[in-house]
């Protein structure tokens, strides 16, 4: 079983990418569980046809410790098992703790015992604070992919996340599998991210082009592969799935200093 964490700055399209990617893996016959580690609890919405899933933390708050796996796990498109860890009430508590509680709960209820090929953790945002680093810190997820675009803040966040990965690489055995570009149609975007990935010591594992089909599918509460399986964008996600499935490059990233990051951005015309 491969345990994969998807990181990236807030709003970059991690949840969309994760759900479309896992749909592609499901088509390849893989057995998958997606664990949403974001208080917004939208990591499995497209797989479940828009169903607002009850989160692990809400269930614990309402029902106490006596929880059945069926209550917190729903089966979505391609038989993908879907769980949302949820978050604390706003202004109270730490969302990162929620992730820890959820993963522990899933382990206790035997969610990992079902012959899974993949578990994906879709993890909130830019901050690699203690709780959000949980899937990598505790050695749950062994491989990480960072979703980025050619925008400065997305790359800044990717560099920061790499610092977190390199910090936990020795203790948790975690490795970076590559950068996934979720294109924003920035000038020289692919070349920029290839140079950025190379500097980090990793690879641009796939470049997902921008497409209106993604938004159309989202409005219909589906992944592109389910909504319009013959569309070119569906094939892009299938190719991303194959790239992840066949990946054999796992590294401890070498995060760069701010001036080096800015030099790469300048070289490709972003800071002109």
Swiss-Prot record:
Class of enzymatic activity (EC top level): oxidoreductase
Domain of life: Bacteria
Species: Clostridium acetobutylicum (strain ATCC 824 / DSM 792 / JCM 1419 / IAM 19013 / LMG 5710 / NBRC 13948 / NRRL B-527 / VKM B-1787 / 2291 / W)
Subunit-level organization: Homodimer.
Positions contributing to ATP binding: 8-15
Keywords: 4Fe-4S, ADP-ribosylation, ATP-binding, Iron, Iron-sulfur, Metal-binding, Nitrogen fixation, Nucleotide-binding, Oxidoreductase
PROSITE patterns from the UniProt entry: NIFH_FRXC_1, NIFH_FRXC_2, NIFH_FRXC_3
Coiled coil: none
Gene name per UniProt: nifH
Reactions it catalyzes: N2 + 8 reduced [2Fe-2S]-[ferredoxin] + 16 ATP + 16 H2O = H2 + 8 oxidized [2Fe-2S]-[ferredoxin] + 2 NH4(+) + 16 ADP + 16 phosphate + 6 H(+)
Post-translational modification: The reversible ADP-ribosylation of Arg-97 inactivates the nitrogenase reductase and regulates nitrogenase activity.
EC number: 1.18.6.1
HAMAP family with a match to the protein in the record: NifH
Role according to the record: The key enzymatic reactions in nitrogen fixation are catalyzed by the nitrogenase complex, which has 2 components: the iron protein and the molybdenum-iron protein.
Cofactor note: Binds 1 [4Fe-4S] cluster per dimer.
Any Gene Ontology biological process: nitrogen fixation
Protein name: Nitrogenase iron protein
Sequence positions bearing ADP-ribosylarginine: 97
Record-level Gene Ontology MF annotations: 4 iron, 4 sulfur cluster binding; ATP binding; metal ion binding; nitrogenase activity
Family named by the database record: Belongs to the NifH/BchL/ChlL family.
Family annotation (InterPro entries): NifH/chlL_CS, NifH/frxC, Nitrogenase_Fe_NifH, P-loop_NTPase
Binding site for [4Fe-4S] cluster: 94, 129
Cofactors demanded by this protein: [4Fe-4S] cluster
